[in-house]
Regions:
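Helix-rich "cap/lid" substructures immediately adjacent to catalytic or cofactor-binding pockets
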Residues: 1-43, 130
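A short acidic-Thr-Gly-centered motif at the start of a beta-strand
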Residues: 3-5, 138-142, 178-189
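Non-catalytic peripheral regions of patatin-like phospholipases
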Residues: 7-11, 61-129, 163-167, 190, ...
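Conserved small-residue
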Residues: 18, 28, 49, 130, ...
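Short, hydrophobic alpha-helix immediately C-terminal to the catalytic nucleophile
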Residues: 26, 53-54, 203-204
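Catalytic nucleophile loop
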Residues: 40-58
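Active-site periphery "cap/insert" segments of enzyme catalytic domains
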Residues: 117-144, 149, 160
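Active-site glycine-rich loop that binds ribose-phosphate moieties when present
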Residues: 127-137, 169, 173-184, 195-201
């Protein structure tokens, strides 16, 4: 897909989910905010991407660019504090981080017992963190950003997109709900799991509902791996990763096919075709940083 310079320096952001790897996106956003040359119209995020989106929106609303940088730092610092230092150890290669054996054993129970049994009281430290950091009532009333948060209906597999007027702590928790660890988050009588199963992230709302033609994709999942997995655990992790990127890749292929069709058109372009021709994608990916990291680092 083609790219160009946007004379108005306004962009949309599409923020991929990826657990703790979302700290990479925090770094990207911090750099963009510090640079100061870009404005933002819409932000679409899934899971950790959704958390980055609302933290950034909260900060922009209360303190401009500096406020957004402060809000993101505050959020990720508080999130890191929820993980005990004893939970991780240095991996054998000396570069990666691995879970301590005791915590690995705890996670293995998730292969045998549902969240209803492992976590009957549905304890989730993320809930306290999100509600403490984000003023959703004020965000819904005052935010200038168009926000889109993806979750997956646990009964149908369909995408549920929460827009700014619908945003709440439950919507963010739904977008980040791993079904093997936490119970489905119920909203309006429907259960929701992690948005990555349906859109990671959703790009189409930035095309249909925003005027800005430039979309910056911040990707956490490697577009290609160096090695083929061989152990059972590594294969499971690769399959799960593919499940979380398949919908995004399909969506991007659709845009690419439409752009190719429009570029070859022999007829006058309508409004939709002109919008396709005038949409530009830009990518910042974590390939060089994330491709060697194990799933445990998430």
């Amino acid at each position: 897909l083609k790219s160009r310079k946007n004379p108005h320096f306004t962009i949309n952001l599409a923020l991929q989910g990826g657990g703790a790897h979302g700290a990479f996106t925090w770094g990207v956003l911090d750099a963009l905010l510090e640079d100061g040359r870009l404005a933002f119209e819409g932000v679409s995020g899934t899971s950790a991407g959704a958390m980055n989106a609302v933290a950034m929106a909260q900060g922009l609303m209360t303190g401009g660019r500096d406020g957004a940088r402060e809000a993101l730092e505050k959020f990720w610092t508080a999130l890191a504090a929820t993980m005990p230092a004893s939970a991780t150890v240095a991996a054998a290669d000396g570069q990666n981080v691995a879970l301590a054996p005791a915590f690995k054993s705890m996670l293995r129970w998730a292969n045998y017992f549902s969240p209803d049994r492992l976590n009957p009281y549905d304890l989730n430290p993320l809930r306290d963190l999100v509600t403490a950091q984000i003023d959703f009532e004020r965000l819904r009333a005052e935010s200038a950003l168009k926000l889109f948060v993806a979750a997956t209906n646990a009964n149908s597999g369909k995408l549920r997109l929460f827009r700014l007027p619908e945003l709440s702590a439950d919507a963010i928790l739904a977008s980040a709900c791993m079904p093997t660890v936490n119970r489905a988050v119920e909203i309006d009588g429907e259960p929701y799991w992690d948005g990555g199963y349906a859109a990671n992230p959703a790009v189409f709302p930035l095309f249909y509902e925003c005027k800005c033609p430039d979309i910056l994709l911040v990707l956490l999942s490697p577009l290609k791996h160096k090695e083929t997995p061989h152990t059972v655990q590594d294969i499971r992790e690769r399959v799960l990763e593919f499940a979380f990127t398949a919908t995004f890749l399909r969506e991007m292929r659709m845009f690419a096919h439409l752009r190719e069709y429009v570029d070859k058109a022999r007829f006058p372009l309508g409004r939709f075709e002109r919008r396709i021709a005038g949409t530009y994608f830009h990518v910042i990916d974590a390939q060089d940083f994330m491709s060697d990291l194990t799933a445990e680092t998430r």
